[in-house]
């Protein structure tokens, strides 16, 4: 399990260890306050971005001296590749442990993620 397995603000492991708690009841009045934590990490975006940049760089890696737009595409694809690789290393080497979804607490998905890390 990762640190995103929450149900009503409690870790799923804690709920399973305490079966006396009536938190898994399908009663709709209790489930309206569920906050859905999305397990999103920047590395999910950085790796495809790095591959896309590398693919674009490979596609335009021929003779770039004759075509100005091809030179521009090649330059920006290399820049995107480098940024993607830096972002991948940044996110994979981080020590983010408590990513939570702020804002709406009615069980709807929100996109604002807050990371409380000691290094960032």
UniProtKB/Swiss-Prot annotation:
Q: Which UniProt keywords apply?
A: Membrane, Transmembrane, Transmembrane helix
- Where does it localize? Membrane
User: Domain of life here?
Assistant: Viruses
Q: Mainly localized where? A: membrane
The record gives the membrane topology as: Multi-pass membrane protein
> Mind telling me which residue stretches traverse the membrane in this protein?
40-60, 72-92
GO CC, alphabetical = membrane
Q: Which family does it belong to?
A: Belongs to the IIV-6 010R family.
Q: What is this protein called?
A: Transmembrane protein 010R
